């Protein structure tokens, strides 16, 4: 029972974004309004395989959230809204940052409804290593794509490690929501999450938008060993490219979802995996190494992998300074080119 409580608490922590400490603004009776978020400044040195090297800086990942909690008939009701500054983002040269809605949901007991993380995210996120890369954090998992990580409408029911999710479908021709069922547990120093995804996936190209049932299964694990932890995940299925981030036509972008998972009118299977290691060197210094890969069983045998390693130093409470190296075997987004990158960042949480 204690292990189930730990798993449920870990997931609840992520959905409430409590990795960013909240500051209580107002408390009146049983109602509390708080503010949280972080400010992140990053500089990225890029060395693409097919282009000239460059350097770009950004603070777009910075975010702010407001949370209201109250008791109604002995039930805790939570409302949460959060935004960052990726509203007009098409690359580092996108111009003046614009506010973007990340989360807007309400939660009562075991039910959460609104715009928030999808079911695939919860199936892997608690078992991942810590990454600095805003795009590509979960590559190699069924939640590798950040494009559809937070559907406009999501319904979660979570209780004692079990989670059922119905979310706004990616396919415009879907007859039902995309659905995810998962179960999480922690046994001593080992934790796992097993999940199944079902969705109406497009099989056509351009105007031929017929759909078929796409099914996928995933397993994510974490093994704690002293001051370190081993992380691993694997998934396989058909119709999963819109969530993994890799399509039969290459890296996912919002314009190719209709043909993402199909070839010659048929859904194509794909398999992905990731392995990682996290180590806490001192109370202030920690590091992570990770490898993620996705392979598609299409005519071109499409495959992409990403390698990364980082060090993060807690300079002051709530103030982290970090550096991360990463290497992509192919382009994953127009602004995430094939080749190497080094990111240097500072992040203050409040």
Task: Briefly describe each language-model feature range.
Residues 8-13, 19-36, 121-123, 138-141, ...:
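Outer-membrane beta-barrel biogenesis signature
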Residues 23-46, 53-180, 184, 222-223, ...:
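Outer membrane beta-barrel
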Residues 44-48, 71, 85-90, 118-122, ...:
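Sequence/structural signature of outer-membrane beta-barrel proteins
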Residues 55-59, 94-101, 146-148, 172-176, ...:
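Transmembrane beta-barrel outer-membrane domains
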Residues 62-66, 104, 153-155, 181, ...:
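Membrane-embedded beta-strands of outer-membrane beta-barrel proteins
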Residues 73-76, 110-113, 159-164, 189-194, ...:
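Repeated loop/turn-to-beta-strand initiation elements of outer-membrane beta-barrel proteins
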Residues 186-306:
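Detector for outer-membrane/organellar transmembrane beta-barrel domains
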Residues 223, 313-317, 338-350:
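Outer-membrane beta-barrel "beta-signal"
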């Amino acid at each position: 029972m204690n292990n189930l409580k730990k798993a449920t608490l870990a997931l609840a922590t992520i959905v409430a974004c409590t990795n960013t400490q909240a500051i209580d603004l107002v408390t009146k009776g049983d109602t509390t309004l708080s503010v949280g978020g972080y400010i992140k400044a990053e500089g990225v040195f890029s060395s693409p395989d097919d282009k000239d090297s460059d350097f770009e800086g950004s603070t777009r990942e910075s975010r702010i959230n407001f949370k209201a909690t109250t008791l109604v008939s002995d039930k805790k009701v939570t409302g949460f809204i959060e935004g960052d500054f990726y509203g007009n983002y098409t690359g580092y040269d996108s111009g003046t940052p614009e506010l973007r809605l990340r989360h807007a949901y309400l939660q009562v007991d075991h039910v959460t409804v609104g715009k928030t993380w999808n079911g695939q995210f919860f199936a892997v996120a608690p078992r991942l290593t810590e990454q600095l890369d805003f795009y590509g954090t979960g590559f190699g998992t069924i939640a590798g794509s950040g494009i559809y990580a937070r559907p406009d409408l999501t319904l979660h029911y979570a209780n004692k490690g079990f989670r059922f999710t119905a979310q706004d479908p990616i396919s415009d021709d879907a007859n039902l929501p995309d659905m995810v069922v998962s179960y999480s547990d922690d046994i001593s120093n080992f934790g796992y999450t097993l999940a199944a995804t079902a969705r109406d996936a497009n099989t056509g190209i351009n105007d031929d938008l017929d759909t078929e049932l796409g099914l996928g299964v995933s397993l994510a694990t974490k093994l704690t060993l002293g001051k370190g932890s081993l992380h691993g995940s694997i998934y396989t299925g058909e119709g999963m490219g819109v969530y993994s981030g890799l399509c039969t036509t290459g890296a996912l972008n919002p314009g190719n979802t209709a043909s993402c998972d199909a070839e010659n009118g048929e859904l194509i299977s794909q398999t992905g995996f990731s392995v990682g290691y996290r180590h806490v060197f001192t109370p202030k210094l920690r590091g992570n190494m990770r490898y993620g890969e996705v392979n598609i069983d299409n005519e071109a045998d499409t495959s992409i992998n990403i390698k990364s390693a980082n060090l993060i130093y807690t300079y002051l409470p709530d103030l982290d300074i970090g550096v991360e190296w990463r290497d992509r075997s192919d382009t994953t987004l127009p602004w995430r080119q094939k080749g190497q990158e080094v990111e240097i960042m500072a992040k203050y949480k409040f």
